[in-house]
Amino acid sequence: MEGFVLAGTSSGVGKTVATLATLTALEDAGYQPQPAKAGPDFIDPSHHEALVDTPSRTLDPWLAGEDGMRRTYWRGTGDICVVEGVMGLYDGTKTSTAAVAEGLDLPVVLVVDAKAGMESVAATALGFAQYADRIGVDIEVAGILAQRAHGGRHADGIRDALPEDLTYFGRIPPMSDLEIPDRHLGLHMGSEAGLDRDALSTAAETIDIERLVETARAPPEVATTERNTGDSPADRRVAVAQDSAFCFIYPSVLERLRSEASVEPFSPVAGDSVPDADAIYLPGGYPELHGESLETGGTLDEIAVRAADGVPVYGECGGLMALSESLTTTDGDTYEMAGVLPADIEMQDRYQALDHVELEARADTVAATSGAHRRGHEFHYSAATLGSDASFAFDMVRGDGIDGEHDGLTEYSTIGTYCHCHGESGAFDRLLAVPSKDI
């Protein structure tokens, strides 16, 4: 599958809208696009999936490793892959959009805010193209997609100012319908506030989609890793919370779980009973927006009983919050949670951690064997007040974790981390492979 990267000059330049317009242009032209996102984000991919009904691939060399990132890419489907970048093209060094483009050998199309410039837009693009050589990054900046650019003289001025080796791939017109509302943690999820399809189709008309398709190329393939235990998926069942409170799930995680087990979704917000399963996974999301439903629905109480019975439970970020004793919102409302892990969670007005992280296991748990390392990402607005009997699974090699030095609160065969892990990280292998009595 061939593809290209839509990279921005900075955060806030309009990469997500440009990506959605490009995906729309591909569909309108008869292609089946595969969306992807550079970096660890959950929210932008939700907009990709809401638009084209295809899960967006998470491409991050820190989370998955170089080979894991390539495997993640090649598990995609469709005619052509559109990779939305993260922040500005070169921001983030080892985890930058440039690092993803280099690791996959994909051409880069630069999204430049052209609202108040013409020749300066070309100068910006030229500088970004030449900067790759300056820092020794092997990427091709193929051209630009002009964001917030009018037609006529404005578009012509940008096109004419570009050097011959930088292609003008079109523009995204300034339109009030192409704005996505945001909140803490970023934009609203795609299922909540997707852009109007007609507005995207209008924007897509000013993109030279065939020229973009001609620019795309395929990354080098990599051998797949066969990790099945030999048991059929039907032999094991994993209950996975999936609703508006638990919506931060990398597709690679579900793929990893499905490779070894039958995945049984359930909704704690709706008060669903927990499916009969060998393990339970609570991903991140927005439990703070659903405190009353989680407190009264009964699902968390049922999870607490399963945890006390020794069923392995793995919670990430929002999952950690749900497994705690209580959750207090920024409005001061406090809700009882599952009460499995000895912590009280309180939401803060600003983020408490944002970074790629690395953890080293202190002991055997459902997430790792002793001494193993796990890489992931943390981004949260909550803080934990710990009980005196708090026990941790991981020491922090990089990042903040729960208390600045540790992550992974444990009790029974349950673990709750602020760290989000990719399906290629190895974090879910032990959850699937080891019976609870052996942990």
Curated annotation (Swiss-Prot):
SUPFAM superfamilies: Class I glutamine amidotransferase-like, P-loop containing nucleoside triphosphate hydrolases. The keyword Nucleotide-binding applies. PROSITE patterns: GATASE_COBBQ (PS51274). Keywords: ATP-binding, Cobalamin biosynthesis, Glutamine amidotransferase, Ligase, Magnesium, Nucleotide-binding. Residues 237-428 form the GATase cobBQ-type domain. Pathway: Cofactor biosynthesis; adenosylcobalamin biosynthesis; cob(II)yrinate a,c-diamide from sirohydrochlorin (anaerobic route): step 10/10. The record marks 420 as: Increases nucleophilicity of active site Cys. Gene3D superfamilies: 3.40.50.880, P-loop containing nucleotide triphosphate hydrolases. It is an enzyme of class 6 (ligase). GO terms for molecular function: ATP binding; cobyrinic acid a,c-diamide synthase activity. The active site is at residue 317. InterPro entries: CbiA/CobB_synth (IPR004484), Class_I_gatase-like (IPR029062), CobQ/CobB/MinD/ParA_Nub-bd_dom (IPR002586), GATase_3 (IPR011698), P-loop_NTPase (IPR027417). Residues 214-235 are annotated as: Disordered. Its EC number is 6.3.5.11. It comes from the Archaea. It catalyses: cob(II)yrinate + 2 L-glutamine + 2 ATP + 2 H2O = cob(II)yrinate a,c diamide + 2 L-glutamate + 2 ADP + 2 phosphate + 2 H(+). The keyword Repeat does not apply. CDD domains: GATase1_CobB. Its cofactor is Mg(2+). It holds the Pfam family GATase_3. Belongs to the CobB/CbiA family. NCBIfam families: cobB (TIGR00379), PRK01077.1 (NF002204), PRK13896.1 (NF010471). Catalyzes the ATP-dependent amidation of the two carboxylate groups at positions a and c of cobyrinate, using either L-glutamine or ammonia as the nitrogen source. Comprises of two domains. The C-terminal domain contains the binding site for glutamine and catalyzes the hydrolysis of this substrate to glutamate and ammonia. The N-terminal domain is anticipated to bind ATP and cobyrinate and catalyzes the ultimate synthesis of the diamide product. The ammonia produced via the glutaminase domain is probably translocated to the adjacent domain via a molecular tunnel, where it reacts with an activated intermediate. The a and c carboxylates of cobyrinate are activated for nucleophilic attack via formation of a phosphorylated intermediate by ATP. CbiA catalyzes first the amidation of the c-carboxylate, and then that of the a-carboxylate. This is Cobyrinate a,c-diamide synthase. It comes from Haloarcula marismortui (strain ATCC 43049 / DSM 3752 / JCM 8966 / VKM B-1809) (Halobacterium marismortui). The gene is cbiA.
